[in-house]
Design a protein with these regions (language model features):
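Active-site beta-strand/loop microenvironment that shapes enzyme catalytic pockets
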Residues: 253-296
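Non-transmembrane, aqueous-exposed alpha-helical and coiled segments at domain scale
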Residues: 288-289, 324-348, 352, 357, ...
Length: 473
């Protein structure tokens, strides 16, 4: 069996680039908060940045070519009369943005913006947020060892149901891209041997050869010997993202990391990594790879070494104290709240469920006849092993089928949802977090969790784009 996690040739910006402006948050964040992305664009200005080579999902499909022609101010920047926004990216059609991304990628590769920072190795990541210090190791996974079909018991598995309709637009972005930037975070169930790791503090270069012998807490062990590694970057992250440092894991240390994860793979019972963040991004990478295999353009030998066979990801330890599972809330807009709540109550009864006053699911809204915020919460008392989010999402999906004007978005953070309820006069639905210790057993038993069940940290604690790798020949 080949290893599913491997070293990579990793690209980073050259030493003259402002790393704080280079690194922006995952494209699937703040999808209802245009002000966030406007502020990012203003802050980055003309500096080299990952903002120029990713497609924030808030803009995906929001403007047609005809709208662009009508709203353009003549300088390639859209004037939005209602919001007063004037941003370059808000004015682009999807096709224009994708073409811009691909062109900018090629420019960064040829003008010296990017350099190979790590050869056949990994990057140890130290991310400091309000939740603490979260560690990770960036490397390549073999997409042949991953599938988003819950029936496939692969080494790398999705944690939530994949919405197939979300994949084609993302394939269009990736299929002609020269490079990839990961915001995918995979989780490994690797209990930490704290006593052994604490004994490694102040380790020397010679201690690196012991990595392969580590049976518990591989990432934490590498972090304990970080002073023996070459530092790659050390920067604050914009928009309250905290601080990040990266270290090159090369040579013998990289070989030992590969062996340590290979040993973990051989003893994991067929399930090594669970997708913590970026389920749909990884599903897109898988789809692109399958399309390449089906294209007939490459021989079997060429496919074995094709760069698109792999995806650059960050591996994090499920047992890290700084890795917190947060709930993902729902926001309904253009909704008749009274009608929706009646529908919800009727469905609860129809399913033979019972509810009492509680906090498992909390609805927050502004009544049409008032300005004050109202909220009501319930617990579902006889749900058995079903999660509240599973019951809720099933009912919402059914409601949306017959109420085409109602829109749903998925929101990270209590304060963000409170603000959006006031701003949109919609209905916010607050959920509780799940116990992360149950994740692997739940996926192993049931396939996937309901979509948008949990989030790793708050929105500003998500992965910021930093490292890159080539995916096209």
């Amino acid at each position: 069996m080949s290893n599913c996690f491997n070293p990579a040739n990793i690209l980073l910006p050259n030493d003259c680039i402002d790393m704080e402006k280079w690194s922006v948050i995952a494209c699937d964040q703040f999808t209802s908060q245009a002000d966030y992305w406007d502020a990012v664009e203003k802050h980055v200005a003309d500096a080299p940045s990952t903002l120029n080579v990713v497609f924030p999902e808030i803009y995906l499909g929001t403007i047609t070519k005809q709208e662009n022609d009508c709203n353009s101010s003549g300088d390639g920047v859209k004037n939005d009369k209602e919001t007063g926004r004037k941003t370059k990216y808000a004015s682009m059609t999807d096709d224009e943005r994708i073409k811009y991304i691909n062109t900018t990628m090629e420019t960064y590769l040829t003008d010296g913006t990017l350099k190979q920072a790590v050869a056949d190795g990994y990057v140890l990541v130290e991310r400091t947020t309000e939740s603490g210090v979260r560690l990770g190791i960036v490397g390549l996974i073999d997409l042949d060892d991953y599938d988003f079909d819950p029936k496939k018991k692969t080494l790398i598995r999705a944690t939530e149901g994949t919405v197939i309709s979300r994949i084609p637009p993302r394939v269009k972005i990736r299929e002609n891209a020269a490079i990839e930037l990961p915001h995918v975070m995979l989780l490994v169930d690797d209990p930490i041997d704290r006593q052994k790791i604490d004994g490694c503090q102040g380790a020397t270069q010679e201690d690196a050869v012991n990595i392969a012998a580590v049976k518990h807490g591989i990432i934490e062990y590498v972090y304990a010997i970080r002073d023996t590694l070459r530092k790659l970057y050390d920067t604050e992250l914009m928009q309250g993202g905290g601080h990040i440092r990266g270290y090159a894991v090369e040579g013998e240390a990289a070989k030992q990391v590969t062996e340590a994860f290979a040993a973990k793979q051989n003893s994991c019972g067929g399930f090594l990594f669970a997708v913590g963040d970026g389920n749909h991004s990884l599903a897109t990478a898988k789809t692109c790879w399958e399309n390449i295999k089906k294209s007939g353009k490459f021989t079997e030998e060429q496919l074995k070494t094709h760069p698109a066979r792999h995806a650059l990801v960050e591996i994090c330890n499920l047992h890290s104290e700084a890795l917190e599972f947060k709930p993902i809330h729902r926001l309904l807009t253009n909704v008749d709240v009274k009608d929706m709540l009646s529908f919800f109550e009727a469905e609860i009864t129809k399913q033979g469920l019972e509810s009492t006053e509680g906090e498992e699911i909390v609805f927050e809204y502004v009544e049409s006849s008032a300005t004050a915020i109202k909220n009501s919460g319930i617990n579902i008392t006889n749900r058995g092993d079903r999660l509240p989010v599973e019951i809720l999402q099933g009912i919402l999906d059914k409601y949306l089928e017959t109420h085409g004007n109602v829109e749903i978005d998925y929101i990270h953070g209590d304060e963000a949802l409170h603000g959006l309820v006031k701003e949109t006069k919609g209905c916010g639905i607050f959920l509780q977090s799940i116990d992360k210790s149950t994740l692997f057993s739940a996926i192993n038993a049931g396939g996937v969790l309901p979509r948008k069940t949990f989030s790793i940290g708050e929105a500003n604690e998500k992965r910021y784009y930093m490292e890159l790798s080539l995916i096209h020949i």
